[in-house]
């Protein structure tokens, strides 16, 4: 009985350690608000190939991000989506601060395909016109004052 309990406790500690590592890999850099980090990760008015575009994101992380979506629209247009009807987030049913874009936008989906060394991340690019769903929150003091509610998470593309 004792070895089984001890083994279970070790497994639990390992699981907790791995989950905290996963959270730290997806955490935003401390110097940015959630909206600023959203803008860096997901707003790109002029499409670039993913291998180049992802450098702006990967330089703040200790690894090559596996995948990412760039919306080819303005931050102000995405802020306007925050005014659409609230809905449960399709990507996380425990959140109800999501909003559907209502219109399709051009976007680029990036998928890591090459070496996973931070200095040499290689991506494939897929272009599409799709709807998107964003989570929005009240602005942080570091966010532009003209936007009381700002996008903080790209939940889903549809």
Swiss-Prot record:
Q: What is its main location?
A: other
**Highest taxon listed in the record's lineage:** Eukaryota
**Which EC main class describes this enzyme?**
lyase
Database matches in Gene3D superfamilies: Ribonuclease A-like domain
Residues annotated for substrate binding in this entry: 65-69
* Localization of this protein: Lysosome; Cytoplasmic granule
State the Gene Ontology BP annotations.
chemotaxis; defense response to virus; innate immune response in mucosa
GO molecular function terms listed in the Swiss-Prot or TrEMBL record: lyase activity; nucleic acid binding; ribonuclease A activity
Which residues are glycosylated according to the annotation? 34, 86, 92, 111
EC code: 4.6.1.18
Using the record's annotations, give every residue carrying the modification 3'-nitrotyrosine.
Answer: 60
In the UniProt record, the signal sequence range is 1-27
The reaction(s) catalysed by this protein are: an [RNA] containing cytidine + H2O = an [RNA]-3'-cytidine-3'-phosphate + a 5'-hydroxy-ribonucleotide-3'-[RNA]; an [RNA] containing uridine + H2O = an [RNA]-3'-uridine-3'-phosphate + a 5'-hydroxy-ribonucleotide-3'-[RNA]
- The protein here is known as Non-secretory ribonuclease
- Provide the gene name from the record: RNASE2
């Amino acid at each position: 009985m004792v070895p089984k309990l001890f083994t279970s406790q070790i497994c639990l500690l390992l699981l907790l350690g791995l989950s905290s590592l996963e959270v730290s890999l997806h955490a935003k850099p401390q110097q940015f608000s959630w909206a600023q980090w959203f803008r860096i990760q997901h707003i790109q008015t002029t499409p670039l190939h993913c291998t180049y575009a992802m450098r702006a994101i990967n330089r703040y992380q200790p690894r090559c991000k596996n995948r990412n979506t760039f919306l080819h629209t303005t931050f102000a247009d995405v802020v306007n989506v925050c005014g659409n009807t609230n809905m449960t987030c399709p990507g996380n049913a425990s959140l109800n601060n999501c909003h559907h874009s209502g219109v399709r936008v051009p976007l680029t989906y990036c998928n890591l395909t090459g070496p996973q060394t931070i200095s040499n991340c290689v991506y494939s690019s897929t272009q599409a016109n799709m709807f998107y769903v964003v989570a929005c929150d009240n602005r942080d003091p570091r966010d532009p004052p003209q936007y009381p509610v700002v996008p903080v998470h790209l939940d889903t593309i549809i």
